[in-house]
Amino acid sequence: MFFYFIKNNDLRVKKIKEELSPIRNLFNSTLKNQLSRYLKGKQKNFSCKINFLNGTDLQKKVWAQLQKISYGKTISYSHLALKTSYQKAIRAVATAVGKNPIGIIVPCHRVIAKDGRLGGYAWGIKMKAKLLDIEVSGMADSIYRGGK
């Protein structure tokens, strides 16, 4: 729980509400159950609808595209840039991926470098490798186990 002490500043209160809106009511019992099942490799999709109110147009477009990456699949940063019509702004797209406020549910862990390296991850490379391992656990030998 967060407490904000604001004196005579309705605009700041509105901004805080906008910042928290994508995750404000997200963690209900259904989603907690779905996350638990996902971490056990038994849940592939999440039933929650996310509307990002906060973020640049580029970020919102990238985050929307992240939600289209299928379970168990990966995409390169450059291919993601192409899919979002920002093919000449790969670094900006990668930065938008890194600013994703809702990991796992908006699966930024599925974005990797063009050469197959994992690239970065806000919650750490080991976590990214683990999430990808969960999703590809049916494969005999996952390339992600080493945290490359």
Model-assigned labels for residue ranges:
Residues M1-S47, K114-A122, K126-K148:
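Low-complexity, small/basic-enriched stretches
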Residues C48-G55:
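Short amphipathic alpha-helical boundary/capping segments
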Residues G55, Q59-W63, I90:
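Short, leucine-enriched amphipathic alpha-helices that occur as contiguous helical runs
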Residues I69-G72:
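Short helix/strand-capping hinge loops at secondary-structure junctions
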Residues L82:
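Alpha-helical residues within the helix-turn-helix
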Residues I104-V111:
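Short Lys/Arg-enriched helix C-cap and helix-to-coil transition segments
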